[in-house]
């Protein structure tokens, strides 16, 4: 296609409550830490219900919840992020993901509010208006510069694993 936006496939994604139960049971069985991705407040309330009915993270660490701001979202950021802090389930580490042209302003607001952020080409391919990134590293570097400007500490790998309650990396063994 002539324009990158023509490459996007218009589709929907859904997961049923029984799919969630099966997935969570398998994660518990294998000690996998789930990431709950929320696209709306109703998703966050659903995660809270799962936690309140007794589902706990098999790693023993905090629940990892990502809230996704998509292109076209029109929330008033400071007030909305304040509300996220109030409605987040207990024992939760909140991560903000933003897509499209407003990624860096949204992630900056998230950092100011004390949230963790995700950045990468899965979510956005631009460093700024009309300037494409050549790599994920460029996007990470930009968000690191923003964090440094607002004096927000940046976790290294070991610190991030500790925050998530993951402990030391496990060695993968292929089983037939």
Model-identified regions with their sequence ranges:
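C-terminal helical cap(s) of enzyme catalytic domains, especially alpha/beta-barrels
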Residues: 129-154
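Catalytic alpha/beta core domains of metabolic enzymes, predominantly
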Residues: 1-122, 132-133, 138
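C-terminal accessory extensions appended to soluble enzyme cores
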Residues: 158, 165-176
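A short, flexible beta-alpha/helix-coil linker loop
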Residues: 124-126
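A glycine-rich phosphate-binding loop feature that marks nucleotide/adenosyl-phosphate handling sites
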Residues: 40-44, 159-166
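Flexible, glycine/charged-enriched surface loops at secondary-structure junctions
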Residues: 36-37, 150-159
């Amino acid at each position: 296609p002539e324009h990158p936006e023509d490459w996007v496939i218009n589709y929907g994604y859904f997961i049923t409550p029984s799919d969630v139960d099966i997935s969570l049971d398998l994660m518990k069985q294998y000690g996998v830490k789930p990431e709950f991705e929320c696209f709306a407040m109703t998703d966050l309330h659903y995660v809270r219900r799962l936690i309140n009915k007794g589902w706990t993270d098999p790693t023993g660490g905090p629940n990892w919840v990502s809230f996704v701001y998509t292109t076209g979202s029109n929330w008033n950021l400071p007030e909305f992020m304040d509300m996220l802090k109030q409605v987040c389930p207990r024992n939760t580490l909140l991560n903000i993901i933003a897509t499209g042209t407003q990624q860096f302003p949204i992630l900056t607001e998230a950092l100011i509010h004390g949230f963790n952020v995700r950045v990468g080409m899965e979510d956005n391919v631009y460093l700024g208006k009309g300037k494409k990134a050549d790599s994920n590293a460029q996007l990470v570097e930009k968000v690191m510069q923003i964090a440094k400007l607002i004096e927000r500490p940046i976790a290294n790998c070991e610190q991030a694993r500790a925050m998530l309650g993951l402990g030391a990396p496990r060695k993968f063994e292929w089983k037939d």
